[in-house]
């Protein structure tokens, strides 16, 4: 091989070496950028992981704090529950005692109630006996009074100069009775009777009631009986002489105090009694006074 060929071969080798060196430089640059990119990515990931770990650590601390708080609350709730259980137990014991006391009280109440019912029955029986005795005494008194007046009238009839009652007045058992021909209110009728030395009739028994019923002549008449009110409620009835009502001859369903102002008593044409407003001017009246000689 001559010198020229060697020169050509050296030139060729030199050209090949230069090309390889250029490619190697290119590879080195690429590798540098790749390493740099990896390094940057690693740093970024490290920063991101650090941030995430810091956030997770903060959240973990918060969660642990909440856990401690929940444990504390759970402990307190457990203590409260235990206290409530104790209170419930005490209340149950108290309820048991109260229930026993109530049962005892109820038994005592039933016993007292039974005794009261027994006493009420005895009292009712006594009242019935007293009522019967009073009714019998009233009948006996009326019979004695009737017999006495009959005897007095018999004695008076023996004296021809004795006139028992004024004209237009009817005699009965020692009293004189005037049956009016006109109508008036109860107060007007009582005033008229007072002017005659009399009063509106007081019916003391069945005999007197029978006498009055025989002379009604199909008309109604005021009696000397009025209601006694207290707080706008009728408490009873009283005659014009102040005596309480012992004998009565009421019509069916009477007295009913219709509309709350039927305070005066009148006798129907049938002889039965009825309550009516004292301002009623549709009825006559009957005056009564003791008989005397003129």
From Swiss-Prot:
Glycosylation sites: 73, 159, 246, 256
UniProt-listed Pfam families: Lectin_C (PF00059)
Entry's transmembrane regions: 31-51
Compartments it resides in: Cell membrane
Coiled coil (residue ranges): 100-151
Superkingdom of source: Eukaryota
Residue ranges annotated for the C-type lectin domain, each copy included: 172-287
GO cellular component, one term: plasma membrane
GO MF annotations, alphabetized: carbohydrate derivative binding; D-mannose binding; fructose binding; polysaccharide binding; virus coreceptor activity; virus receptor activity
Disulfide linkage: 264-278
Extracellular side: 52-294
GO biological process per UniProt: alpha-beta T cell proliferation; immature T cell proliferation in thymus; negative regulation of alpha-beta T cell proliferation; negative regulation of immature T cell proliferation in thymus; negative regulation of T cell mediated immunity; negative regulation of T cell proliferation; positive regulation of viral life cycle; T cell mediated immunity
Principal subcellular localization: membrane
InterPro entries documented for this protein: C-type_lectin-like, C-type_lectin-like/link_sf, C-type_lectin/snaclec_domain, C-type_lectin_CS, CTDL_fold
Stretches in topological domain Cytoplasmic: 1-30
Gene3D superfamilies hit by this protein: Mannose-Binding Protein A, subunit A
Membrane topology type: Single-pass type II membrane protein
UniProtKB keywords: Cell membrane, Coiled coil, Disulfide bond, Glycoprotein, Lectin, Membrane, Signal-anchor, Transmembrane, Transmembrane helix
Function: Binds mannose, N-acetylglucosamine (GlcNAc) and fucose, but not galactose, in a Ca(2+)-dependent manner.
UniProt protein name: C-type lectin domain family 4 member G
